[in-house]
Amino acid sequence: MAIQRKSDSASLVHIYTREYGKVLYMVYGGNGGGRKRSRGINRNILTPLSWLEIEGDELSGKSLHSMKFAQLHYVPQHLSFDVRRQCLAMFMAETLYKTLRHPLSDDRVFDYICNQIVELDTSDSIEHISSQFVSQLSELLGYGGEPLEEFQNLRSAALLNMLSTS
């Protein structure tokens, strides 16, 4: 979800996992010059919305864990080369980073995120992905508002009311 540079040789990586929810990993090596690959981790795959298979230390109540190995679970076809898709991926990753604050796992949220990664990568039309993403994520997290159709009907009625009173 998010990467924070800690020093020249280490970064903190916030990842949302199916089993543990939001987890903080320390990844060593490859922050500036030097090697891009460290301890079985290719740093180039640590991008916003990367769907990874990871191996780390045992999660036993610690808040910071060490990542030992990572590889892509889903290899994007278009996301890596399309700047618009990359910008949307950064927006989605930042939204997830800000909204998923606790280390609680939720299979529905994890599956939704994975489906959105594939959708962002493969969809021909990406214009409305950001608003749909936020709306559907809000509903999954329990912040669901009025359905979109009702909102559009209210907006249309308000617009007609404004036009008729002018």
Regions found by a protein language model. Give the residues of each.
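Non-catalytic alpha-helical scaffolds and adjoining flexible linkers that form interface surfaces
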Residues: 1-11, 16-166
